[in-house]
Amino acid sequence: MPAFVNERRVGPVTILELAPRLTHAEGSELHHVVSGLLDSGSQAVLLDCSRVTFIDSLGIGGLMRTWLSVGKRGKLKLFGLPPYFRQVLQITGLLKVMDSFDDVGLALRSFEP
């Protein structure tokens, strides 16, 4: 299954709508796609997590690897976390380091200087 089901741009921000499952394969693809976006000059990536219904430890690892690879090259943020996904990210401590928003509008505005 692909890591995301839709890609769109809103101004300088690329929004990737994640697929319902985030496992090793999807996490690896997500890392590859986000790296490609950064290589092509995009500096703002927003992950729409509203469809995610399952994430395993390898999916968490892929998400973390993606976030770490963005580093100083750009910004990666999340929005629309379902309760299950939010709880997983809280337990793992990732919500302390990753910016997340409930609303796409707030998330998009957070990229403004």
Q: What is each model feature region?
A:
Residues 1-17:
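Short beta-strand/loop segment at the start of cytosolic alpha/beta domains
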Residues 21-98:
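Amphipathic alpha-helical interaction surfaces in cytosolic regulatory modules
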Residues 99-103:
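Short acidic-hydrophobic, aromatic-tinged amphipathic segments that line or gate anion-handling sites
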Residues 111-112:
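Short, hydrophobic alpha-helical segments
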